[in-house]
Amino acid sequence: LQIVDGVPLECIDGINTNDITSMEILKDAASAAIYGSRSANGVIIITTKSGQEGKARIDIKYNHSWGTLSHKVPQANRKERLLYDQYRKEYFETYGGGNPDESSDILNDPLNSFFNVDNDYLDMITSTAQKDQVDISVGGGTKKLKYFINTGYYNEKGIISNTGFQRLNTRINSDYSPTDWMNMGSRISLTYSKKKGLNEGTLLSAVLTRRPYFNTYYPDGSLVGVFNGQKNPIAQVNYTTDFTDSYKANFFQFFEIKFNKYLKFRANINAKFYLDKRKKLEPSLITDEWQ
Protein backbone atom coordinates (compact mmCIF):
# COMPACT_ATOMS: atom_id res chain seq x y z
CA LEU A 1 0.00 0.00 0.00
CA GLN A 2 1.31 3.44 -0.94
CA ILE A 3 0.28 6.55 0.99
CA VAL A 4 1.21 9.93 -0.49
CA ASP A 5 0.52 12.94 1.74
CA GLY A 6 -2.08 10.90 3.60
CA VAL A 7 -3.85 9.66 0.46
CA PRO A 8 -3.80 5.96 -0.55
CA LEU A 9 -2.73 5.58 -4.18
CA GLU A 10 -2.87 2.47 -6.35
CA CYS A 11 0.14 3.50 -8.41
CA ILE A 12 2.99 5.91 -7.68
CA ASP A 13 4.87 5.71 -10.98
CA GLY A 14 3.69 9.24 -11.78
CA ILE A 15 5.44 10.79 -8.78
CA ASN A 16 8.53 12.84 -9.48
CA THR A 17 11.32 11.79 -7.12
CA ASN A 18 12.32 15.44 -6.78
CA ASP A 19 8.92 16.14 -5.18
CA ILE A 20 9.62 13.74 -2.29
CA THR A 21 10.93 15.05 1.02
CA SER A 22 10.67 11.84 3.09
CA MET A 23 9.74 8.17 2.80
CA GLU A 24 8.87 5.69 5.54
CA ILE A 25 8.13 1.96 5.38
CA LEU A 26 5.82 0.34 7.93
CA LYS A 27 5.58 -3.42 8.41
CA ASP A 28 4.38 -3.80 11.97
CA ALA A 29 0.97 -4.52 13.45
CA ALA A 30 0.29 -0.82 13.89
CA SER A 31 0.08 -0.34 10.13
CA ALA A 32 -2.49 -3.15 9.88
CA ALA A 33 -4.54 -1.54 12.64
CA ILE A 34 -4.60 1.77 10.74
CA TYR A 35 -4.92 0.66 7.12
CA GLY A 36 -6.48 -2.79 7.43
CA SER A 37 -5.96 -5.73 5.09
CA ARG A 38 -4.56 -3.51 2.34
CA SER A 39 -1.37 -3.17 4.39
CA ALA A 40 -0.69 -6.93 4.53
CA ASN A 41 2.51 -6.45 2.52
CA GLY A 42 3.52 -3.28 4.32
CA VAL A 43 2.90 0.43 3.87
CA ILE A 44 5.04 3.00 2.09
CA ILE A 45 4.38 6.50 3.40
CA ILE A 46 5.60 9.31 1.15
CA THR A 47 5.59 12.98 2.09
CA THR A 48 6.07 15.56 -0.64
CA LYS A 49 7.81 18.90 -0.29
CA SER A 50 6.17 21.99 1.18
CA GLY A 51 7.05 25.65 0.97
CA GLN A 52 9.20 27.27 3.64
CA GLU A 53 8.76 30.68 5.18
CA GLY A 54 10.88 33.29 3.44
CA LYS A 55 11.52 34.81 0.07
CA ALA A 56 10.61 32.89 -3.05
CA ARG A 57 13.34 30.48 -4.08
CA ILE A 58 13.69 29.17 -7.61
CA ASP A 59 15.59 25.94 -8.22
CA ILE A 60 16.51 24.45 -11.59
CA LYS A 61 17.90 20.93 -11.74
CA TYR A 62 19.14 18.89 -14.67
CA ASN A 63 20.33 15.30 -14.57
CA HIS A 64 21.70 13.12 -17.35
CA SER A 65 22.55 9.46 -16.88
CA TRP A 66 23.26 6.29 -18.84
CA GLY A 67 22.17 2.69 -18.49
CA THR A 68 23.54 -0.56 -19.91
CA LEU A 69 22.90 -4.27 -19.53
CA SER A 70 24.57 -5.56 -16.39
CA HIS A 71 24.82 -9.06 -17.86
CA LYS A 72 24.39 -10.57 -21.30
CA VAL A 73 23.16 -14.14 -21.66
CA PRO A 74 25.87 -16.18 -23.44
CA GLN A 75 24.71 -17.41 -26.84
CA ALA A 76 26.10 -19.84 -29.38
CA ASN A 77 27.69 -18.22 -32.42
CA ARG A 78 27.25 -19.44 -36.00
CA LYS A 79 30.00 -22.07 -35.84
CA GLU A 80 28.83 -23.47 -32.50
CA ARG A 81 25.18 -23.63 -33.59
CA LEU A 82 26.07 -25.31 -36.90
CA LEU A 83 28.06 -27.93 -35.00
CA TYR A 84 25.10 -28.53 -32.70
CA ASP A 85 22.71 -28.82 -35.64
CA GLN A 86 25.07 -31.27 -37.37
CA TYR A 87 25.21 -33.52 -34.28
CA ARG A 88 21.45 -33.24 -33.93
CA LYS A 89 20.90 -34.24 -37.57
CA GLU A 90 23.24 -37.23 -37.27
CA TYR A 91 21.52 -38.37 -34.08
CA PHE A 92 18.08 -38.33 -35.71
CA GLU A 93 19.40 -40.13 -38.79
CA THR A 94 20.92 -42.84 -36.60
CA TYR A 95 18.26 -43.32 -33.95
CA GLY A 96 15.19 -41.86 -35.60
CA GLY A 97 12.62 -39.56 -34.09
CA GLY A 98 12.74 -35.79 -33.94
CA ASN A 99 12.16 -33.45 -36.83
CA PRO A 100 15.42 -32.10 -38.26
CA ASP A 101 14.42 -29.03 -40.23
CA GLU A 102 17.63 -28.09 -41.98
CA SER A 103 20.34 -29.64 -44.12
CA SER A 104 23.94 -29.20 -43.08
CA ASP A 105 24.98 -29.25 -46.73
CA ILE A 106 22.85 -26.17 -47.40
CA LEU A 107 23.77 -24.41 -44.17
CA ASN A 108 27.48 -24.77 -44.87
CA ASP A 109 27.14 -23.60 -48.48
CA PRO A 110 29.30 -20.44 -48.70
CA LEU A 111 27.30 -19.31 -51.74
CA ASN A 112 24.06 -19.27 -49.78
CA SER A 113 24.19 -15.74 -48.39
CA PHE A 114 20.97 -16.17 -46.42
CA PHE A 115 22.65 -18.62 -44.04
CA ASN A 116 26.19 -17.26 -44.22
CA VAL A 117 25.91 -14.74 -41.37
CA ASP A 118 26.79 -14.69 -37.68
CA ASN A 119 24.27 -12.62 -35.72
CA ASP A 120 24.40 -11.58 -32.09
CA TYR A 121 20.73 -10.62 -31.76
CA LEU A 122 20.98 -9.25 -28.25
CA ASP A 123 23.75 -6.92 -29.33
CA MET A 124 21.74 -5.91 -32.41
CA ILE A 125 18.63 -4.81 -30.49
CA THR A 126 20.26 -3.14 -27.48
CA SER A 127 22.24 0.03 -26.94
CA THR A 128 23.20 2.40 -24.13
CA ALA A 129 20.12 3.95 -22.56
CA GLN A 130 20.01 7.73 -22.20
CA LYS A 131 18.08 9.42 -19.38
CA ASP A 132 17.38 13.14 -18.98
CA GLN A 133 15.45 14.87 -16.21
CA VAL A 134 14.75 18.59 -15.81
CA ASP A 135 12.98 20.16 -12.82
CA ILE A 136 12.01 23.78 -12.21
CA SER A 137 10.57 24.58 -8.78
CA VAL A 138 9.63 27.66 -6.82
CA GLY A 139 8.80 27.75 -3.12
CA GLY A 140 8.43 30.22 -0.31
CA GLY A 141 5.80 31.99 1.73
CA THR A 142 4.94 33.84 4.89
CA LYS A 143 4.12 32.68 8.39
CA LYS A 144 0.52 32.09 7.35
CA LEU A 145 0.81 31.04 3.71
CA LYS A 146 3.42 28.70 2.21
CA TYR A 147 3.63 27.25 -1.27
CA PHE A 148 5.70 24.87 -3.38
CA ILE A 149 5.37 24.42 -7.16
CA ASN A 150 7.43 22.04 -9.25
CA THR A 151 7.30 21.10 -12.92
CA GLY A 152 9.44 18.23 -14.14
CA TYR A 153 10.18 16.53 -17.44
CA TYR A 154 11.71 13.05 -17.68
CA ASN A 155 12.81 11.36 -20.90
CA GLU A 156 14.33 7.88 -21.09
CA LYS A 157 15.53 6.04 -24.15
CA GLY A 158 15.33 2.33 -23.37
CA ILE A 159 18.16 -0.17 -23.57
CA ILE A 160 16.11 -2.12 -26.13
CA SER A 161 15.85 -0.23 -29.41
CA ASN A 162 12.66 1.71 -30.10
CA THR A 163 11.52 1.68 -26.47
CA GLY A 164 11.30 4.60 -24.11
CA PHE A 165 9.38 6.55 -21.52
CA GLN A 166 8.49 10.23 -21.19
CA ARG A 167 6.77 12.01 -18.31
CA LEU A 168 5.65 15.57 -17.71
CA ASN A 169 4.32 16.40 -14.26
CA THR A 170 3.37 19.41 -12.16
CA ARG A 171 2.83 19.55 -8.41
CA ILE A 172 1.29 22.44 -6.48
CA ASN A 173 1.38 22.24 -2.67
CA SER A 174 0.05 25.01 -0.45
CA ASP A 175 -0.56 25.46 3.28
CA TYR A 176 -2.55 28.24 4.93
CA SER A 177 -2.77 28.93 8.68
CA PRO A 178 -5.06 31.93 9.30
CA THR A 179 -4.85 31.38 13.08
CA ASP A 180 -2.84 29.31 15.53
CA TRP A 181 -5.69 26.82 15.82
CA MET A 182 -6.73 26.50 12.17
CA ASN A 183 -4.81 24.98 9.25
CA MET A 184 -5.80 24.14 5.71
CA GLY A 185 -3.95 23.11 2.61
CA SER A 186 -4.06 21.48 -0.78
CA ARG A 187 -1.97 19.03 -2.79
CA ILE A 188 -2.48 19.03 -6.55
CA SER A 189 -0.63 16.65 -8.84
CA LEU A 190 -0.97 16.49 -12.64
CA THR A 191 0.93 13.91 -14.71
CA TYR A 192 1.10 12.93 -18.35
CA SER A 193 3.30 10.04 -19.47
CA LYS A 194 3.95 8.21 -22.71
CA LYS A 195 5.44 4.74 -22.86
CA LYS A 196 6.77 3.08 -25.98
CA GLY A 197 7.20 -0.62 -25.35
CA LEU A 198 7.41 -4.08 -26.84
CA ASN A 199 6.34 -7.57 -25.89
CA GLU A 200 9.63 -8.23 -24.13
CA GLY A 201 8.85 -11.88 -23.43
CA THR A 202 8.26 -12.68 -27.10
CA LEU A 203 11.20 -10.54 -28.18
CA LEU A 204 13.73 -12.11 -25.80
CA SER A 205 12.44 -15.57 -26.69
CA ALA A 206 13.22 -14.83 -30.34
CA VAL A 207 16.65 -13.50 -29.38
CA LEU A 208 17.52 -16.71 -27.52
CA THR A 209 16.02 -19.27 -29.93
CA ARG A 210 16.54 -17.91 -33.46
CA ARG A 211 19.55 -19.43 -35.17
CA PRO A 212 22.45 -16.97 -35.47
CA TYR A 213 23.09 -17.97 -39.10
CA PHE A 214 19.59 -16.91 -40.26
CA ASN A 215 19.81 -13.61 -42.07
CA THR A 216 17.63 -10.76 -40.83
CA TYR A 217 17.28 -9.09 -44.25
CA TYR A 218 16.48 -10.37 -47.73
CA PRO A 219 18.84 -9.43 -50.60
CA ASP A 220 16.46 -6.62 -51.62
CA GLY A 221 16.89 -5.00 -48.19
CA SER A 222 13.48 -5.92 -46.77
CA LEU A 223 13.28 -7.47 -43.31
CA VAL A 224 12.75 -11.19 -42.90
CA GLY A 225 9.62 -12.05 -40.97
CA VAL A 226 8.99 -15.43 -39.35
CA PHE A 227 11.33 -17.97 -40.92
CA ASN A 228 11.40 -21.67 -40.14
CA GLY A 229 8.97 -21.01 -37.28
CA GLN A 230 11.33 -18.51 -35.63
CA LYS A 231 10.58 -14.80 -35.33
CA ASN A 232 13.05 -12.16 -36.41
CA PRO A 233 13.81 -9.93 -33.38
CA ILE A 234 15.01 -7.12 -35.66
CA ALA A 235 11.63 -7.08 -37.40
CA GLN A 236 9.86 -7.13 -34.03
CA VAL A 237 11.81 -4.10 -32.83
CA ASN A 238 11.28 -2.12 -36.03
CA TYR A 239 7.65 -2.91 -36.81
CA THR A 240 5.90 -3.32 -33.46
CA THR A 241 3.79 -0.34 -32.41
CA ASP A 242 2.88 -0.24 -28.72
CA PHE A 243 2.21 3.19 -27.21
CA THR A 244 0.49 3.89 -23.88
CA ASP A 245 -0.58 7.44 -23.02
CA SER A 246 -1.45 7.95 -19.35
CA TYR A 247 -3.22 10.93 -17.79
CA LYS A 248 -3.34 11.23 -14.01
CA ALA A 249 -4.67 13.95 -11.74
CA ASN A 250 -4.88 13.94 -7.96
CA PHE A 251 -6.56 16.66 -5.90
CA PHE A 252 -6.30 16.63 -2.12
CA GLN A 253 -7.66 19.22 0.32
CA PHE A 254 -7.51 19.17 4.12
CA PHE A 255 -9.00 21.31 6.87
CA GLU A 256 -7.84 21.08 10.50
CA ILE A 257 -8.93 22.68 13.76
CA LYS A 258 -6.92 22.27 16.98
CA PHE A 259 -8.99 22.43 20.15
CA ASN A 260 -6.00 21.78 22.41
CA LYS A 261 -2.77 19.82 22.26
CA TYR A 262 -4.67 16.57 22.81
CA LEU A 263 -7.68 17.05 20.56
CA LYS A 264 -8.07 18.19 16.99
CA PHE A 265 -10.53 17.79 14.13
CA ARG A 266 -9.37 17.09 10.58
CA ALA A 267 -11.33 16.65 7.35
CA ASN A 268 -9.78 15.34 4.12
CA ILE A 269 -11.23 15.57 0.63
CA ASN A 270 -9.61 13.68 -2.22
CA ALA A 271 -10.44 13.26 -5.92
CA LYS A 272 -8.48 11.15 -8.39
CA PHE A 273 -8.60 10.82 -12.16
CA TYR A 274 -6.84 8.17 -14.24
CA LEU A 275 -7.01 7.54 -17.98
CA ASP A 276 -4.87 5.17 -20.06
CA LYS A 277 -4.97 5.02 -23.85
CA ARG A 278 -3.09 2.22 -25.58
CA LYS A 279 -2.33 1.75 -29.26
CA LYS A 280 -0.83 -1.60 -30.23
CA LEU A 281 -0.14 -3.03 -33.67
CA GLU A 282 1.78 -6.15 -34.67
CA PRO A 283 1.80 -6.60 -38.47
CA SER A 284 1.67 -10.05 -40.01
CA LEU A 285 5.34 -9.72 -40.94
CA ILE A 286 6.34 -10.46 -37.36
CA THR A 287 3.57 -12.91 -36.47
CA ASP A 288 3.08 -15.11 -39.56
CA GLU A 289 5.35 -17.47 -41.50
CA TRP A 290 7.03 -15.57 -44.33
CA GLN A 291 9.49 -17.31 -46.61
What would you call each of these model-derived segments?
Residues E53-D118, I159-T163, N169, N173-N250, ...:
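Surface-exposed loop/interface segments of Gram-negative outer-membrane beta-barrel transport/assembly proteins
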Residues L111-G139, K143, T287-Q291:
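Outer-membrane beta-barrel transmembrane domain signature of Gram-negative proteins
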Residues G36-S37, T126-Q130, G139, N162-Q166, ...:
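Short sequence motifs at beta-strands and strand-loop junctions characteristic
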Residues A33, S39-Y62, V134-I136:
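N-terminal periplasmic accessory domains that precede
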Residues E53, K131, T142-K143, S177-W181, ...:
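Outer-membrane beta-barrel channels and translocator barrels
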Residues L9-C11, A29-I34, G51-G54, W66-L69, ...:
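Short beta-strands and strand-coil junctions in structured, solvent-facing domains, enriched
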Residues D5-A33:
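Short acidic/polar hinge/loop motifs at secondary-structure boundaries
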Residues T48, I60, I136-G140, T170-Y176, ...:
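Residues on the lipid-exposed face of transmembrane beta-strands in outer-membrane beta-barrel proteins
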